[in-house]
Amino acid sequence: MKVAVGSTNPAKVEAVREVFLGIYGDVEVVPIEVDSGVPDQPVGLEETVKGAINRAKQAIEKTDADFGVGIEAGLYRVPETITGYMDVQFCAVVDREGRITLGHGPGFEYPPGVIRRVFEEGVEVGIAMGELVNDPELKRKIGAIGVLTHGMLVRKELNKLAVLMALVPRLNPEWYGL
């Protein structure tokens, strides 16, 4: 089985590789640099989902893969949170028939100073968080979640949960009409 990932970010590519390998066995994963078609910092579930779907569709279109996978992180409004926003990773999986399945991982809140920079300066959360901890490559490694959870959960693992949730309908095709 061949799986194209609409990203070259190691935290995304390895997450896809590990989940697909665990479910399907022998898997070839091909990272493809694509344009998400949404702002670098998506805001709202609609924008975030659109980015994940765009990445998945472009990945499968540019290859002969069986599946295209897109992962997009974005902020969305949540009442009663400290900042008013939470971050979530959405995953889209597209097959050769054009069927899309979606999933997302756990949501979490960025520190208020990071959210303020996003909305006042237009800085992407990953960049703002990387600057906060003096690690410009943070989002390609343990991610903000790795820093915020003191290493208990890293970005790859967060992405793996989103990928697994997107595969739920494919693991149970008879219940989802696939």
Curated annotation (Swiss-Prot):
Binding-site list for substrate: 7-12, 64-65
Cofactor entry: Mg(2+); Mn(2+)
Its EC number(s): 3.6.1.73
Reaction catalyzed: XTP + H2O = XDP + phosphate + H(+); ITP + H2O = IDP + phosphate + H(+)
Cofactor: how and how many bound: Binds 1 divalent metal cation per subunit; can use either Mg(2+) or Mn(2+).
Residues noted as binding Mg(2+) in the record, renumbered to the chain: 35, 64
Any single biological process term in GO: thiamine metabolic process
Family annotation (SUPFAM superfamilies): ITPase-like
Signal peptide: none
GO molecular function: ITPase activity; metal ion binding; nucleotide binding; ribonucleoside triphosphate phosphatase activity
A Pfam entry, by short name: NTPase_I-T
Job of this protein: Phosphatase that hydrolyzes non-canonical purine nucleotides such as XTP and ITP to their respective diphosphate derivatives. Probably excludes non-canonical purines from DNA/RNA precursor pool, thus preventing their incorporation into DNA/RNA and avoiding chromosomal lesions.
Similarity comment: family membership: Belongs to the YjjX NTPase family.
Subunit structure: Homodimer.
Protein name: Probable inosine/xanthosine triphosphatase
Origin species: Thermococcus kodakarensis (strain ATCC BAA-918 / JCM 12380 / KOD1)
